[in-house]
């Protein structure tokens, strides 16, 4: 396996040019940022929640989180919402405005919960994604979507900006090498002791690393204590400011 890894890294070093990240994320209507990963446990939910909080603070504007995976309430330290959510909404033949399901988290951040529908995020069809994108585009709120793990081209294609959350993991990068749709940028969760780094990830994915987040225990403690919404770690918000 070591020989295979070394050969693969050598190939990565000579791969195609990585496009520059030229997007800005203004707090304007129709701006939808989709955060996604290729494997569970990559940190997508924490990144999604923290990015929404950072955007609201930096822009002094309303930001909402669409939770397709169901873990955002736990990450934010709020009670699990009851009632319908985005999965129920997508399965309704006649839909009320999606903002009717928004739950306040802070003064400027709200949540559209996953809900109790049987629809899983990896079951989203092109019709589902187009319906959701059209609805979100009608609002003047900036939206961050936690799309969980799995490659959902229909969802990524409808995003203003898509961010792949990934660790420098050989297995994750093997999956990334076969993506049919590339992200606009990468949030790299750095772990000590990994053989792979930023250049390897950029070469395989074909997109620039916008943020390198250290695997910091203070972030985990903040989430475990339910304090992310009220006391986002400074280090986390400072790093995500490069995206926001």
For each predicted feature, which ranges?
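Cytosolic-facing regulatory segments adjacent to core modules
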Residues: 96-105, 111-152
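Conserved catalytic-core segment of NTP-binding enzymes
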Residues: 131, 135-222
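Phosphate-binding loop that captures ATP/GTP phosphates
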Residues: 58-111
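Generic beta-sheet signal
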Residues: 31-35, 63, 112, 141-145, ...
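A generic structural signal for short coil/turn motifs at secondary-structure boundaries
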Residues: 41-44, 75, 119-123, 222
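A short, acidic, flexible beta-alpha connecting loop/helix-capping segment that sits on the rim
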Residues: 116-117, 215-219, 227-228
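Acidic-aromatic/histidine active-site loop/patch
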Residues: 1-33, 79-98, 127, 174, ...
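Walker A (P-loop) phosphate-binding motif
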Residues: 20-63, 68
């Amino acid at each position: 396996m070591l020989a295979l890894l070394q050969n693969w890294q050598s190939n990565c070093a000579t791969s195609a040019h990585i496009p520059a990240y030229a997007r800005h994320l203004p707090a304007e209507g129709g701006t939808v940022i989709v955060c996604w990963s290729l494997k569970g446990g990559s940190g997508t939910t924490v990144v999604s929640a923290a990015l929404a909080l950072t955007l609201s603070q930096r822009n002094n504007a309303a930001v909402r989180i669409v939770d397709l995976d169901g873990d955002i309430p736990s990450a934010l330290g709020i009670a699990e919402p009851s009632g319908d959510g985005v999965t129920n909404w997508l399965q309704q033949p006649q839909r009320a405005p999606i903002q009717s399901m928004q739950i306040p988290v802070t003064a400027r951040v709200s949540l559209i919960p996953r809900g109790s529908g049987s629809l899983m995020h990896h079951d989203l069809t092109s019709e589902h994604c187009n319906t959701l994108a059209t609805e979100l585009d009608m609002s003047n709120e900036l939206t961050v979507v936690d799309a969980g793990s799995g490659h959902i081209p229909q969802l990524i294609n409808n995003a203003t900006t898509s961010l792949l959350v990934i660790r420098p993991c050989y297995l994750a990068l093997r999956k990334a090498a076969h993506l049919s749709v590339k992200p606009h940028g990468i949030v790299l969760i750095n772990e000590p002791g990994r053989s792979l780094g930023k250049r390897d990830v950029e070469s395989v994915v074909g997109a620039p690393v916008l943020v390198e987040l250290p695997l910091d225990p203070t972030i985990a403690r903040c989430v475990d204590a339910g304090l992310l919404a009220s006391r986002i770690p400074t280090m986390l918000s400072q790093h995500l400011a490069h995206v926001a």
